[in-house]
Amino acid sequence: ITGNRCERGLGKEKVKNKLPNLFEYKMQRYFGYTPLKENEAVHGVIGIPRVLNMYENYPFWFTLFTKLGFSVLLSPASTRKIYELGIESIPSESECYPAKLAHGHVQWLINQGVTHIFYPSIPYERKEFADANNHYNCPIVTSYPENIKNNMDPIVQGEVDFIHPFLSLESEETVAYRMVEELGEKFSIDEKEIRAAVHDAWEELAACRNDMRKKGEETIQFLKETGNRGIVLAGRPYHIDPEVNHGIPELINSYNMAVLTEDSISHLNPVERPLNVMDQWMYHSRLYAAANYVKTVDNLDLIQLNSFGCGLDAVTTDQVAEILTNSDKIYTSLKIDEVNNLGAARIRIRSLLAAIRVREQRNTKRDIKPASIDKVSFTKEMRTTYTILCPQMSPFHFE
């Protein structure tokens, strides 16, 4: 019996798969911290939900609060039970699943009796790519703490101190200034102490990101030495959550392929710009950079994870596909939501493997093309021979 969620058929011995799985590595590297014991925490316990932007920045916040003398209580890895804890306060069915999970994580912290919960709104991430148009977080990641604040009764009724400052991670100084504002008076912490903690936290976050890059390079070297193939399972930081990705990384491992994350290779081949899209979203920039590296190597392919309800990914899927297919690489996208059914994913992955085998047999040489486009400027002379199509998107669009 095969074809179900199990990676082996009935009666077969389970074989330990030793191929790299960077989803598993990243989960451990980013969240494998040991908090202070409560009797050592001079400022008590502070809860942090394991959601959305925390998959990008938790090492920073853990280090900051630990250095300041807090015992950090992190909500557990997502499960269906966690999701159901907060289901009553979810305001819209059309939200992406990672956003819906946030309600359950915050409710779990409340159930533990935590009096302070920290979950910041971060419109700007650090600028990882200097030539990108900007470095925003998406609207959901940016403002979801506001949604939590207005839809969860214990917070609305003031039973919990919900700390949700708007701040930018563009620079260490910017964060330090805001943390002094938010934490200094509230917890009677000296400005110098906060700035020192922010510095240590900034260094720890940089170390985490460097470790991911090193692990990516090690995995690529491993694939070269062993002759194995790898899949870059590209998505958002929160797609490393097993409840969100539904075990797809392990499924790929079961087909004897290594699994890499987009941020483990996004530094290896800078994107040629300008792109066809406005490259202003931080997580998107990594997707484009990862695809730009994958197009240059034969033993890597890319599968993009796309959450239902993510409007911005309508842009990324087209751009990532364009970068890959222009250099004769295969683009595969997997849409995921709260439904835990890997049947369709298995079919897509098997189809990708079959297509790869066919291409290897043909041994066709690929023409690797830059990701940039040549934009044509509209000149005065074109007025007589060209028509501009510009649909009116709102009543005052042309005013």
Report residues per predicted region.
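An N-terminal assembly and electron-transfer interface module characteristic of large anaerobic redox
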Residues: 1-399
